[in-house]
Amino acid sequence: MNQKSVLITGCSTGIGRCLALGLHARGYRVFASVKQEKDIAALRAAGLESLALDLRAPDSIRAAMDEVLARSGGRLYALINNGAYGQPGAVEDLTREALRLQFETNLFGTQELTNRVLPVMRARNE
């Protein structure tokens, strides 16, 4: 069977988890990524292929992509950039470091992952 492989970030809870389970139920091969190792087992128990991916860490992004491509035979049909977090508080109360961490996850990490995925998808016209 030639399942279409999908990588989804931020699958521990909420929308990411629902998307992962929903696409899996529709026959997609879902690589559900989570930031914390402790969340992997629950997703695997639900029938998903799960892996650790910390969008703040370039080495984690690289390792996750290597793992997904190895397990999918170098094929990836879609990337769903769901992993992110909100930094609550008034802007004047937030430190530069708090905002930097949020941008590392929500912007820079997402951009880096997307830049790694696009050539794979384009090469296969998927």
Report each predicted region and the residues it spans:
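A hydrophobic alpha-helix adjacent to the NAD(P)-binding/active-site core of NAD(P)-dependent oxidoreductases
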Residues: S50, L94, Q102-F103
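Active-site loop of short-chain dehydrogenase/reductase
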Residues: K4, G74-L76, R122-E126
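Substrate-binding pocket helix/loop in short-chain dehydrogenase/reductase
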Residues: A90-V91, A98-R100
